[in-house]
């Protein structure tokens, strides 16, 4: 039996013969794998029983906290006891589905809010866009059309398509309202800046929870729009951008191992 002081997931992987006496098997070992969503130290008491009695021993496990955690965030918006995470994954190369690591720019912000109040994903997004002058969001109502970021922190962003030319002056509190006709093929003119969205890629919304960034398998594609998504303590709202090909339309998943903290405001 196992007594665990802190929550761990236990998976029995296999049974293996380990000890024989006079060519007879006298015991087998069960092999277990222990996993945890959170880092920390864990005490496990193991008890073995046979016809001669029983004995116990204690194991101490330490789960390494190498995964990106909420405590790693640098750029915070809001006040309150609860925390949520907002993150965007840009891809600079042509292959959105299978980018090289160096083509991925994936950053996260923190959002604090009062547990006695109710906030949605759009509330968090707008608050962070207002607070961080490097973040730019194009939307149509509450539909997110695209995300931009001032990569070299020069206080400027410039986006251009065949029909539209935007600068930082066109954004109010980090937001710009686009029509369905004027957002096609926007590109940043400064190679150090980031932009993805418009009509060649659609924003894709993923949800997760926990003190650390969820694994790719633990992120769930959101079944609700951002204005209907109610925040929970330790919730994660992550945006990727997926190619519009009008055939497979496969959503691009987050790549958690590449996430890092958005820099704090100057």
Predicted regions and their residues:
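Extracellular and select intracellular beta-sandwich modules with Ser/Thr-enriched
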Residues: 28, 53-59
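Residue-level detection of beta-strand-connecting loop/turn positions
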Residues: 22-23, 52, 209, 221
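Surface-exposed, flexible coil segments in extracellular/virion-facing regions
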Residues: 18-35
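Exposed beta-strand face motif in extracellular beta-rich ectodomains
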Residues: 40-44
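Ubiquitin-like/PB1-type beta-grasp interaction modules and other compact soluble beta-rich domains
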Residues: 58-266
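A short beta-strand segment in extracellular, disulfide-stabilized domains
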Residues: 1-12
């Amino acid at each position: 039996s196992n007594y665990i002081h802190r929550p761990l997931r236990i998976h029995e992987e296999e049974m293996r013969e380990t000890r024989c006496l006079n060519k007879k098997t006298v015991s087998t070992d069960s092999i277990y794998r222990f996993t945890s969503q959170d880092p920390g130290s864990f005490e496990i008491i193991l008890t073995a029983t046979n016809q001669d009695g029983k004995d116990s021993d204690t194991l101490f496990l330490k789960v390494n906290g190498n995964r990106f955690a909420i405590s790693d965030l640098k750029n915070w918006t809001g006040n309150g006891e609860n925390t949520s995470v907002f993150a965007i994954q840009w891809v600079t190369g042509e292959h959105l589905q299978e980018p090289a690591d160096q083509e991925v720019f994936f950053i996260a912000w923190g959002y604090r809010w009062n547990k006695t109040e109710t906030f949605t994903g759009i509330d968090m997004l707008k608050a962070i866009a207002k607070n961080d002058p490097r973040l730019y969001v194009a939307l149509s109502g509450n539909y997110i059309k695209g995300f931009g970021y001032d990569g070299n922190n020069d206080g400027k962003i410039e986006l251009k398509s065949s029909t539209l030319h935007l600068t930082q002056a066109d954004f109010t509190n980090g937001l710009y309202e686009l029509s369905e006709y004027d957002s096609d093929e926007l590109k940043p003119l400064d190679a150090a800046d980031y932009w993805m969205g418009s009509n060649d890629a659609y924003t894709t919304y993923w949800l997760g929870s926990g003190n650390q960034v969820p694994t790719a398998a633990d992120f769930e594609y959101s079944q609700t729009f951002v204005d209907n998504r109610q925040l929970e303590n330790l919730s994660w709202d992550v945006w990727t951008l997926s190619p519009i090909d009008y055939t497979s339309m496969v959503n691009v998943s987050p790549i958690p191992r590449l996430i890092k903290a958005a820099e704090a405001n100057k």
